Amino acid sequence: MTNKKRRQRGSRTHGGGTHKNRRGAGHRGGRGAAGRAKHEFHNYGPLGKYGFKRPESAQTEVLEVTVQKLDEDAALYAADDLAEEDGDAYVIDARDVVEDGYEADVVKVLGGGQVRRELRVTADAFTAGAVELIEEAGGEATLSERAEEAADESENTSDDEDDEA
């Protein structure tokens, strides 16, 4: 027998107040958050700001497209003048074929699936798997001018930081 239970021996209500109190949930004002009139306040959520929000200038919007989708839809892109046919190869700029591609900061080509056509894809970023699939099919993955400029810029800033240190 637990100590508390032992102590309560001989007590009529075992610490529960009067004999009326431990009948159902009435003594507690209902179950859970019952009773919304000034009583459990369940309809008032937490207020105020909390957490951390990165500034808009620090956020980059990345749109993604898979190599398999580019491969499957290459003929459609060529028909819609979104891509060019160069012999057996399709020359595709990922920004042209992704919806809102020119509004995004980065358009990235992801690997996955199969590539049956020779593709020459230009994008801001590629995964290693995407580059591998494109090159296995005889195509090439080229970084866009925008991505190269950003890479040059980051190299310049890191060189400046090294000089200061």
Swiss-Prot record:
PROSITE patterns: RIBOSOMAL_L15. GO terms for biological process: translation. Residues 1-30 have a biased composition (Basic residues). Residues 1-39, 137-165 are annotated as: Disordered. Pfam families: Ribosomal_L27A. Residues 150-165 have a biased composition (Acidic residues). InterPro entries: Rbsml_uL15_N (IPR027386), Ribosomal_uL15 (IPR030878), Ribosomal_uL15/eL18 (IPR021131), Ribosomal_uL15/eL18_sf (IPR036227), Ribosomal_uL15_CS (IPR001196). Keywords: Ribonucleoprotein, Ribosomal protein, RNA-binding, rRNA-binding. GO terms for molecular function: rRNA binding; structural constituent of ribosome. The keyword RNA-binding applies. One of its GO terms (cellular component) is cytosolic large ribosomal subunit. Binds to the 23S rRNA. Belongs to the universal ribosomal protein uL15 family. Part of the 50S ribosomal subunit. This is Large ribosomal subunit protein uL15.
